[in-house]
Design a protein with these regions (language model features):
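Nucleotide/phosphate-binding catalytic cleft detector across ATP-hydrolyzing
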Residues: 2-186, 194-312, 318-365
Length: 365
């Protein structure tokens, strides 16, 4: 009366409206109300998960230990990496990612599900929107595999972005400005080289030579020269301790323990940085060639910008001793290493969670 609703009428109207609003929501929209958005750097060597409002909450090896007798997951991440080369016959440690893309779909799905649950404190009803970084030259089939794995791991929405682009964002480069930025992201499975301007990739190249390939080169070198067999973890440790891309001012040596392939017993040798540099030479040359090609194909105006701003290195491979010096010598350009190279991709994707306008501009799927 008097043109107003009574309390009962207002209550009835509210209930009707609520029912209509609820009915109009699709399931994904409803789940999103109770979710926390995630940014995932799904790497060949490591997976990093960035939670909106929290930062990086997961940083673990992309490894899953599976029990072959029953197909059960025994361990994921750090715990699974500890098992590499040490598992009993019925347990196998698997890297489900190879060269930056999914090699084992089912294991990747289980790994993703584990990391998503861990990022959300083991909550069961979690259906986040997810943004995932992928290599530049990924095929449609490989894209579909990443998207399907994320949905099967309970994502409500999935977006893909190029790793080189988000690595540049994570390194703090002004990618939306009308000037050239060059980033070289050396991960575990791929090296992505990109020239970026106005939030777009002007040129990009992805080569499947990166950290894991360099580790394998060390393993093969020690086999060939010393008949010494070492595992992946040891090879990675050698690479980061005495590995280099250019002659060091002060020579380094390191004791290496492994199994002699002829005698079949444990042996220890001492190796110098010059030998490991020789082992890494072919892989480093492939990366250098990708950088040279990118520079040759960059438009003149952007080349001038890169001459001023230089090249920025991201990813774990950027930490190889004197790689920046090698690139500087061969290109004549300034070279810098990002402040937190290992986290650049995850940090860059994480920024997209708060800037969906920019995400829409750079997303490739």
């Amino acid at each position: 009366m008097y043109g107003f609703f009574t309390l009962t009428q207002l209550s009835d109207t509210s209930v009707t409206f609520s029912k209509q609003a609820f009915a109009s929501m699709n399931i994904r929209s409803l789940f999103s109300l109770f979710s926390s958005d995630l940014a995932i750097d799904l790497g060949t060597a490591n997976t990093l998960v960035y939670a909106k409002g929290k930062g990086i909450v997961v940083n673990e090896p992309s490894i899953v230990a599976i029990n072959k007798s029953n197909g059960e997951v025994e361990a994921v991440g750090k715990e699974a990496k500890e098992m590499l080369g040490r598992t009993p016959g019925n347990i196998v440690a698997i890297r489900p990612m190879k060269d930056g893309v999914i090699a084992d779909f089912k294991v990747t799905e289980r790994m993703l599900n584990y990391f998503i649950q861990k990022a959300h404190g083991r909550k069961m009803l979690v259906h986040p929107r997810i943004v995932i970084g992928v290599p530049s030259e990924i095929t449609q089939v490989e894209k579909r595999a990443v998207i399907d794995s994320a949905y099967r791991a309970k994502a409500s929405e999935v977006h893909l972005v190029e790793q080189a682009m988000v690595a540049a964002i994570g390194a703090g480069l002004p990618i939306t400005e009308p000037g050239g930025n060059m980033v070289v992201d050396i991960g575990g499975g791929t090296t992505d080289v990109a020239v970026i301007s106005l939030a777009g990739i002007v040129y990009s190249r992805s080569v499947r030579v990166a950290g894991n390939e360099l580790d394998e080169a060390i393993i093969q070198y020690l086999k060939r020269k010393y008949n010494l067999l070492v595992g992946e973890r040891t090879a990675e440790h050698i690479k980061m301790t005495v590995g280099s891309a250019f002659e060091l001012e002060k020579p380094l040596t390191m004791e290496i323990k492994g199994r002699n392939l002829i005698e079949g017993v444990p042996r220890t040798i001492t190796i110098g940085d010059d030998e490991i540099r020789e082992a890494l030479a072919e892989g480093i040359s492939t990366i250098m060639n990708a950088i040279r090609v990118a520079l040759e194909r960059t438009p003149p105006e952007l080349s001038a910008d890169i001459s001023d701003r230089g090249i920025v290195l991201t990813g774990g491979g950027g930490l190889i001793k004197n790689l920046d010096k090698r690139i500087r010598q061969e290109t004549g350009l300034p070279v810098s290493i990002a402040e937190d190279p290992l986290a650049c991709v995850a940090l860059g994707i994480g920024k997209m969670l708060s800037d969906f306008k920019l995400l829409r501009r750079i997303a490739i799927e």
